[in-house]
């Protein structure tokens, strides 16, 4: 677990950008395009849903982060979207709109997240085995 957490801390990165619809930025090996933003309504909230297109050579995918406003409490939440890959996860969130019309966009690349979870599961199974063994001794 220590190795996976150390690798995650050493390799992960985070950047914040100010973007308008149509803007493109480079983040590590990815090119990210802010394709569009749209208003969507649900039964108990309305959301601003953004569409970001990630491209890296042959690999192209889209992520859709949201800002939601719930009708009952008037509460505003930020819903991130995550691209899950075997070695790394890419998180994207959309923040507030600035006075110049641009949006704050936060990008994170986290490595070896699944390895951290697998390590925790192995440790838990080890603890269960130790407890079971003591009961039957």
Where do the model's predicted regions map?
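Solvent-exposed, non-transmembrane regions of integral membrane proteins
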Residues: 1-137
């Amino acid at each position: 677990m220590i190795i996976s957490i150390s690798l995650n801390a050493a390799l992960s990165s985070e950047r914040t950008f100010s973007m308008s619809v149509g803007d493109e930025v480079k983040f590590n090996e990815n090119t990210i395009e802010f394709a569009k933003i749209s208003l969507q309504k649900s039964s108990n909230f309305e959301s601003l849903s953004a569409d970001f297109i990630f491209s890296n050579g042959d690999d192209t995918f889209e992520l859709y982060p949201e800002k939601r406003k719930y009708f009952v409490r008037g509460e505003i939440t930020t819903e991130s979207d995550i691209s899950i890959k075997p070695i790394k996860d890419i998180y994207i969130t959309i923040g507030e709109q600035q006075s110049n019309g641009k949006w704050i966009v936060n990008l994170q690349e986290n490595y070896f997240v699944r390895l951290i979870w697998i390590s925790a599961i192995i440790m838990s199974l080890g603890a269960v085995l130790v407890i079971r063994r003591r009961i039957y001794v």
